[in-house]
């Protein structure tokens, strides 16, 4: 694979979202070949990458992070070393766990509001200036729901994968996460209905 083509001292920057344990195993294998391995999952989507505004959550030792950072600045505005190997992936799991719950909660709230007779504009005007506001309200409701124009940018299958990574991580530290488990079940139902 890739390692057979790497010279000692090469840094592999893995920008996928995987379990921290997987990253730590890959880093150990890379180290056996004299190669550094840094996890660097992102938030901000395709548009963020095109505009160079991604948030990049890095897991690596300080020296590796500092060497790789200038390359990441081409696509990222906020490039942070979260901790050692796997910690970027851990942060991404926590972030996407919260994102998934926020998106599911917003969808549920808007359907309830509509069934109670509220229109989208009124709900947006109130929620966006009240305690229910969030990134999801600002970014998703304004962009997709208000203009009644939905263009998918993040597949439900990917969100589901991220939620299952959170479930796996929680089991690993023996922590129940019942809200996330319920949210994961909602995404699983949607996938089963063909909305992957």
Located regions from the model:
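Beta-strand segments within the central parallel beta-sheet cores of soluble alpha/beta enzyme folds
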Residues: 71, 121-129, 181-185
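Rossmann-fold dinucleotide-binding core
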Residues: 8-12, 17-100
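Short, conserved loop/helix-junction motifs that constitute active-site signature segments
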Residues: 2-7
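Interdomain hinge/lid region at the active-site interface
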Residues: 85, 135-195
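Active-site-proximal catalytic alpha-helix in oxidoreductases
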Residues: 51-59, 80, 84-116, 127-140, ...
